[in-house]
Regions:
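Terminal alpha-helical segments
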Residues: 1-152
């Protein structure tokens, strides 16, 4: 199987900036991260009514695990320098607008975790929507993961 062709230029750019790095061995198996995404989403869903802020953050974490699983399956992982933005850039470049909500989840999670101005709490409706968006990302990752090979 050849590497995923869409987004090659962006992945090469992120590697050059050291925002992504190559990994091998167990670190290049995205399945365990995808399983963690499913578990985390279940937890987020179960606490939405009682703790919307935490549910939102967990929904984002679940989406991030799924996105990182797609990178891992290609022998890639974000570095500390690249962080969550590198994950967003890579998956959007490779897999398109189906992952657009990841950016919103990431930005809103930052607002909740590091409040400065504006709405610094979530509510049940927003948390429920975050769980649904995360579920869509995870379902897409479930479909994509078996079709990915090393980016080399």
């Amino acid at each position: 199987m050849a590497r995923w062709p869409r987004g090659e230029v962006e992945i090469e750019r992120l590697l050059g900036l050291k925002h992504l790095q190559a990994v091998t061995g167990a670190a290049a198996n995205g399945q365990s991260l995808l399983e963690k995404a499913h578990r985390t989403l279940g937890t987020a869903s179960s606490i939405t009514a009682n703790d919307p802020d935490s549910a939102f953050v967990l929904a984002y974490d679940a989406a991030r695990y799924a996105a990182t699983a797609l990178l891992a399956q290609q022998g890639l992982r974000p570095t500390t320098a690249g962080g969550h933005i590198a994950v967003e850039s890579a998956i959007r470049a490779q897999f398109g607008d189906g992952f657009r909500s990841f950016g919103f989840l990431r930005r809103r999670r930052n607002e909740l975790e590091y409040p400065s101005a504006g709405t610094t709490t979530s509510d049940i409706d927003e948390a429920t929507d975050a769980v649904a968006q995360s579920r869509s990302i995870i379902e897409a990752a479930d479909q994509l993961l078996p079709n990915l090979s090393f980016f080399s």
